[in-house]
């Protein structure tokens, strides 16, 4: 079986002819000590950490960085002058008036992300083909722009669909451009495949939201090929882990990211055990993070990948706090083939579901979910309708 393209990328980035697990861990320790030296010299948020460590085992003795730290002390984590910052990504928490979370990136940080994207996409994007990108395009090398750069590096053509387009506009793109591949979130992809089931997309990489197993199975059936899940976040430079042709989990970008799995108390967990993902961004130039608790729930696979890669693999990733996630409800409601999309609102009575589909008489309904009374209103989908969520699917 073909080895993960990410392994070749790691070798090229690090100037190595081959990569063993020992090589990788030696590299991680070297980069970690270089980072600790930078932090000590800078004297910022991490200035009180040790100057160096003798082994990766000692990492667990370092304190965690929390989301609250990032909100309150983020400026003290930046190691470059503002003139060298190419992009700042800001995230505010809905329903709060607290400080926004800002992540800073240098030009080199962004270039490395593009390079990783190209490596991951090379598994499914072929020279001379077209790739439909349903991700945000925000200018100044935003996410959509970075993906487009990666597609161009592969000598393919990006079709910049973005987010917020109507189904009519998206179907026109499919008809006129005839892209072979898709990059975007899972539910919008499923919706498109249900609206245009024939002569449509052939391959896809999904990211930015959870893809329930039943939905993944249907997407793969409609595509006629396996899905390539990707995991990334602002804190890790958008690019974190991607699936290989063995389809046995997502290989981590371990030359740039030191990852751990811990329990709720912060104790390290072995491979195979589910817990919270903790990351140290070893290669980040502008704003490296040390032992950042992501709030994401996953595990490392214990067994080696059949593709032969030595890079750790993540299982499916979800949020630690599942209270507002729609993944479970999506699994139930999208089991009806007529559903195109829906939106939920929390009311005094329970949960109000409003959605559209291709056959309203076949729309599903469940009266109770997680103790909530669930009420519905379904209608036929129109060309003017848009996907109900531009980001992660949550109860509003």
Where are these regions (language model features)?
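Conserved AMP-binding/adenylate-forming
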Residues: 217-304
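Active-site phosphate/ATP/adenylate-binding loop shared across adenylate-forming ligases
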Residues: 1-5, 13-15, 67-218, 222, ...
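Conserved beta-strand termini and adjacent loop/short-helix elements that scaffold enzyme active sites
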Residues: 161-163, 230-232, 262, 347, ...
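AMP-binding/adenylate-forming catalytic core of the ANL superfamily
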Residues: 182, 278, 282-371
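Residue-level signal for inorganic ion chemistry
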Residues: 39, 93, 182, 232, ...
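Generic structural signal for residues in well-ordered beta-strands
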Residues: 158, 227, 259, 342, ...
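Nucleotide 5′-phosphate-binding alpha/beta core
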Residues: 1-92, 98-112, 119, 265, ...
